[in-house]
Amino acid sequence: MGSDKTSQTRCRMSEASSGALLSPNNSNNVYSSPSSSHQSNASQETFGSSTGNQSDASQATFVSTISQEKEQLKWDADKELKRTSKMLLKMQKWSLLIGLLTINGVFIWIAFQYPRAYYFTVILLTANTAFQGLMILCICAVAFYTHVLSRLWRKKVARPETSESLVYLLPCYNENMEELTRSLESLVIQKNVDPNPKFILVIVDGNVKGPGMTKTTQEYLLQDILGPGQFQRFHNGYRAHDGLHMPVDIQHGTFKGIPYLFVGKTHNMGKRDSLCFARSFLYHYNRRSEDTETIFNKDLFDYMGTLLLQAGMEKVDLLAGMDADTIFDEMCIHEMLEVLRDDPALAAVCGHVCVDYDGNPWGIWSMYQGFEYSCTQGLRRTFQSTVTGKVSCLPGCCQLIKVCEETFGDLILRERFGYCPKPNDMMTTQIMGIYSEDTAHAVAFFSLFPKTRTAQALRAKAFTIVPQNWKVFLSQRKRWSMGAVSHHFTMAFRPGILWIERLLALVTVATWAITPFTIAAIANVIIAFVKDSNHLWHDAASLGLFALLAIIYVSPFLVLNMFDLMLTNVF
């Protein structure tokens, strides 16, 4: 009953309100009803009921199982930068691949669709080969000039009165005990360098095991090869390539009469980081840098400097670099020294890298890579050494570099060679920051110091172990090709580079870019031989072309190997 009365009262109040609003003088009129007493009673009853409900609700509680989010920004700038940079790199990679495939596809289609177009395509296919032929002619011309003409008025070069001090650098990663022992032994047995003060610096990048190894490379060196020595750990050794501090283990002693310093890095940061460590240390040691910011912890820097002083080295003149899978010929260091002494303007010299056949001279893998070394790396380095004086790749497995501003200064090591790519850098910059550190170093000081010159010592032979299976071979060639092509592409547009080097760099990049087209052209030649071999054998133009190609490809091998003695006597 109470609820019925309440509803009736609310309806009447609503009607009264409507009537009052509709009245033209609603402000002066008062609405009254006989049921006003019922309204008052109903209101009191309703008020009493709501008061009871509020009293019950005040005693209730609400319990949930939710949890609040952590206090943090809605997005992480570092993560977003890395994600965006990774996406941009993928876009660049796929754009390059699609572009190269499109270009090669068009060339292949033109070559097969329009046979007369070979007047154009032959230029692309033979550009690199033509330059190889030009290199051989230039080498022979310079050899004739040097060997026959200039001997009449050649001046004697003043030799240094005191023997140059040498530091042997051996960067390692995951080499086994046999490789490490062979490399160190080849340094110890070097001939005709006895008067020179010598010091061995071994840097191990991380503490890892290679395939089939029972110990890490650091353990092999410390426990089995170098023997006992004074050991010390520096928790804050130096600032690594990525900008963070690197803990290092240090041991020094004597290895077969030569003082050594072992530096074991806790984490793997790459060979470039190890090279920056050694080169920057020697540069600042020679300068006796004071009040200068370096990558080194002061305690570590002073500790290593003390070891050099105790070894009788007031100053380090030359740094000889090699790889832990390489062995030097017993006259290697001496031959590189002779080239440097003959031309004091040289900043660095590299040796002649040969394949280590390891008792199997007829192995297919070794024979092919030996021929490849001669036709590609050896020929170009000989041309650069004798004609331009700018060997653009000083192989890390055999090099001798002067410790000076042009080679090891902060401008080179910290801003160019030691540059750590940012996540949003271009793809070529990322590649150059990882691969081909040998080319990166030479190109950097050629660009910043255009008058710097380098050379190759053909008699300074180093023997390196080459891959013996497809997996390792393709992995190595991937690193080499990506690094070399990126450096050659940028070298073509950098200041301070000779015009002939720019042209050679562009030809190298173009030859790499049309590799699928080259393979298709070779396949087309094979098909033509199969279909119409009789006609080709009787065609003078075809025979002449094949003979010329054979001469150009075989001659580098002959020049650098069969006539090696003659060339080294000349140069």
Q: What is the role of each PLM region?
A:
Residues 107-119, 123, 504-571:
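Membrane-embedded multi-pass helical conduit in multi-pass membrane proteins
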